[in-house]
Amino acid sequence: MRSYDIVVIGGGPAGLAAAKSAAENGCTSILLIERDTKLGGILNQCIHNGFGLSHFGEELTGPEYAFRAYEELKNTIGSLSDPKSGKKDPAVEILLDTFVMEITPEKTIYAMNKKDGYFEISAKAIILAMGCREKARGALAIPGTRPAGVMTAGLAQHYVNIDGYMVGKRVVILGSGDIGLIMARRMVLEGAEVLACIEIAPQPGGLARNITQCLQDYGIPLYLRKTVTAIHGKDRLTGITVSEVDEKYTPIPGTEQEISCDTLLLSCGLIPENELSRKAGISIDPKTGGPFSSDVHETSVPGIFACGNVLHVHDLADNVTKEAIEAGKAAALYVSGAPSTADQAISDPKVFPGKAVKPLNSSSEKALQQDPSSDGSSDGDTEVHHMTCIICPRGCSLTVTPGNPPKVTGNACPRGENYAIAEISHPMRTLTTTIRVRKEDGTIGRISVKSNGEIPKQEIFSLAGKIHKTIIESPVGVGDEVLPGVIATSST
């Protein structure tokens, strides 16, 4: 049986940060297990920007954030291995393409992979960092047939961004979580017609900035207080029935509306991935779907810690990293003899919501009533413009009053003022997409790319079209310029 001080299960942002933190805090025997063939977790398919503002101090795409997190782990191991530090060389072993089937309260791990088959691992401490999963159609109980073309937004994201498959031509998004909003924009950039985003609640579930840059920028209507009440089609989806709902979210008879479409993407919530937690006898919080935990993220089973979306769903990867750093430190201290805090696991784990991160607020709701293809709403002849700032996840509600210079209110920082003034005269955006790459064996793969800085919003489609027609040659590294003004955000 293999033995380690700490075993981290999951190689996404939480797992990478937890392993790094454990090494920094004196642990010299760490195993990081990832079921995929590469590290990074869900970040690898999240090619959009918006990551890293807190942890790295700059806006990154998901693959860039994953690359930086891995580089941080490697650099930490290298610096701690310096003989001048006087510390024992830390060892962080990584097992990819390895599936963990079960963990026990005694911290025995049962796993398997193609190389080693079935094997057991013993650990002094375990850090759970398995992330979360989407609610599928079965959990939503949508009536109707079971044709092709109905899938979660995350699955569609993988098909489009990783595999290069187009999932449909006429698309409806059910739910307004951030992944659904982001995929609405992504589908338009890939040539699909996104007919609507439908939300059962009276306000969107995603961040206000994503309402602006994913829906309003591309003329995609958002319908609130509505839901899908039937799915139609035999082999392929042919359409859906949409109904209004009352205050109890019950469909209202007589409000049905038919929409012809071939694809329905579900963005209706995330659930912590906790099958392993339950098998280990860890108490699960019914409010979060994740484990009860102490202030240092130790679960109800001594020596088993949890961090990231497996503990509770986060809005921002930066907050996942912050939480994982704490969990890694606590696990290292536990291994070195610190007392367990398992008896302090409570029903309200410490949450990092970010600084005023919020969904669309009531003061911004008027923007939904405007032409979604416009840059912002205005109050008649007064030329007062209302908009949501997209600079950071805070999503401030801005008002621009004409003058010389224009007066901007509602912003929390100077960047918001600059954004608002520019948004009226020359709106700018960053394009993120994928490009085909010819590998060394002659096969065609795909990597993520972005515009090298912001470009005029009206040039988004022309640049996207140019990228989609291009095949580049490998090798390509993160940060390489693959076309004039276009840089790679992942590598071959």
Protein language model annotation of sequence segments:
Residues M1-I9, Y65-R170, E247-G254, L265, ...:
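FAD-binding core/adjacent interface of flavoenzyme oxidoreductases
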Residues C307-A338:
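A conserved FAD-binding loop/helix module that cradles the flavin
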Residues F119, A125-L222, T229-R236, L311-H312:
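Predominantly flavin-linked oxidoreductase catalytic cores and closely associated redox partners
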Residues L128, V150-V160, T263-H314:
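FAD-site-proximal beta/loop scaffold in flavoenzymes
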Residues K322, E383-I472, G485:
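Signature of N-terminal electron-transfer/Fe-S-associated modules in redox systems
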Residues Y4-E71, G168-N210, K287:
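Beta1-alpha1 glycine-rich phosphate/pyrophosphate-binding loop at the start
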Residues R68-L80, G86-P105, I109-A111, V188-E275, ...:
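A Rossmann-like FAD-binding core segment of flavoenzymes
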Residues H312, L333-E365, D379-T382:
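Active-site-proximal substrate-binding core of FAD-dependent oxidoreductases
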